Regions:
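Long, acidic, intrinsically disordered low-complexity segments
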Residues: 2-18, 213-228, 308-326, 331-336
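Non-catalytic C-terminal interaction segments of nucleic acid-processing enzymes
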Residues: 2-57, 380-382, 389-431
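Residue-level signal for secondary-structure boundary elements
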Residues: 27-30, 101, 373
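Interfaces and regulatory segments of ATP-dependent nucleotide/adenylate/phosphodiester-chemistry enzymes
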Residues: 34, 39-40, 46, 60-63, ...
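Catalytic core segments in nucleotide and nucleic-acid processing enzymes
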Residues: 261-431
């Protein structure tokens, strides 16, 4: 890019009018094309982002195209979407320039806004599928004297979670290009038929075409721009039915459907349950995962202590490695959909939440240093760290989080020394 040139000067267009051309093609040809190219970037264990880059097609572009294929659809057309038109549509989707990016550029905030929006679109499908399935298996089968997630899950979903995770794993495997290259089509079809025989599970992750459009409309109205960056309905329902046909345009989204999306379904409009899951389940998971690290020399769940007559609790998990110790706090928050709409007020709200979490850990570290509670031994301040662990990251600017955290601390204490500021910046992280 030449010096002085705006980012938008390098992009093709700032209109979504081209999407109306999707009405010319049959729904079947559009969604099967999405499925074909989705499968090409799927290995048996993950969505291969390196391959996606080489193929010049990103998962979020396929997801956007499949969503708009349903929105822009006519039942009386017969023309099929060909490969060249598919490629052109993907390029147009990729090169769309949102006016929110122009506003961010004017404010000198383009890098952080672009990274945030891009990450929210791309991060959910990245990574190995087995660790993710393991994590949510732990969540949905967790039982202690405070919560029985097995029973809760069956009561809300009608099936046990093991059936869902097995179904998701098999779907992912069967639709990956690696599997399709190794197993003959007939044999693979036999396997898929057996997997789809679990009608109760299939129903949980399937949405009818018109209902899909209704849900998208409820989320974003008729605003095509918000739909462009917004969370797609197929993250919850990757299977789309139309009359006697069933489509899965992005097969890899079956993993998202039975993990983070399923947790959101279980806790929908039930903040009490989500708080309990955060307190009992996710804290326990964090403790169990950290305790299995071979480098950990000491670990403790949260410790109750008092300051004067007031009862306090430490961070969720405290773990040491030699002479270093880390305070971990788990946060089961979910990024607001408004963040994807470039809503500065909502972005600032999430920054404030993260900043409060940072200061909460800072106070715990200070309380330890002041002698309000003890660990297995004495640790020097420079060897004490804080980690805010978020289940779903809003990917807001960490720089703004730290600035806000220092601002909050200054309101509490009147002044914040450069030493304290530097300590917070260098020793407390959000991951």
């Amino acid at each position: 890019m030449k010096r002085g040139m705006k980012m938008s000067d390098n992009l093709v267009h700032s209109s979504l009018d081209f999407l109306k051309d999707l009405e010319k093609f049959t729904l079947e040809s559009k969604l099967l094309a999405c499925q074909k190219y989705s499968s090409r970037i799927m290995t048996c264990s993950r969505v291969d982002m390196e391959k996606a880059y080489k193929e010049n097609i990103m998962p979020w572009e396929i997801e956007a195209l499949s969503a708009y294929s349903i929105i822009y659809n006519k039942s009386d057309v017969t023309e099929k979407l060909d490969s060249d038109t598919f490629a052109n549509m993907i390029t147009l989707i990729r090169n769309y320039w949102h006016e929110g990016l122009s506003d961010a550029e004017k404010k000198g905030m383009y890098p952080e806004i672009f990274i945030m929006i891009s990450a929210l679109q791309q991060f959910p499908v990245q990574g190995l599928i087995l660790p993710k399935l393991f994590r949510y298996h732990y969540f949905f089968t967790f039982v202690n004297d405070k919560i029985d997630m097995k029973t809760i899950f069956i009561d809300k979903m009608g099936v046990d979670y093991e059936r869902l995770e097995k179904f998701a794993f098999m779907v992912f495997m069967c639709f990956s290009k690696e599997t399709q290259d190794e197993i003959p089509p007939h044999s693979l079809q036999v396997i898929i038929t057996k997997v789809f025989a679990d009608r109760d599970v299939l129903k949980l992750v399937t949405i009818e075409k018109e209902e899909y459009k209704n849900q998208l409309s409820e989320l974003y109205g008729d605003n095509l721009i918000d739909q462009y960056y917004g969370l797609k309905v197929q993250y919850v329902y990757p299977f789309i039915s139309d009359d006697d046909m069933m489509y899965i345009p992005s097969p890899y989204l079956i993993i998202n459907a039975v993990t983070e999306s399923m947790l959101n379904r279980i806790t929908f409009q039930d903040n009490k349950l989500r708080r309990t899951i955060g307190k009992e389940v996710i804290e326990s998971y964090l403790y169990d995962i950290i305790s299995q690290l071979g480098t950990v020399t000491w670990i403790s769940p949260e410790i109750e202590y008092k300051i004067a007559k007031n009862k306090k609790l430490t961070s969720d998990v405290i773990a040491a490695e030699g002479n270093c110790v880390a305070f971990y706090d788990a946060k089961a928050i979910t990024p607001s959909l408004k963040v994807r709409k470039f809503d500065e007020e909502e972005i600032e709200k999430d920054i404030g939440i993260y900043a409060e979490d940072v200061i909460q850990i800072y106070h715990q570290i200070q309380n330890y240093l002041l002698g309000h509670f003890k660990l297995d031994k004495k640790y020097e301040k420079e060897k004490i760290y804080g980690i805010v662990v978020v289940l779903e990251d809003a990917v807001v600017s960490r720089k703004r989080v730290y600035v806000k955290a220092v601002e909050l601390l200054r309101k509490e204490q009147g002044t914040v020394s450069e030493e304290i500021k530097n300590y917070i910046y260098s020793h407390i992280k959000v991951i």
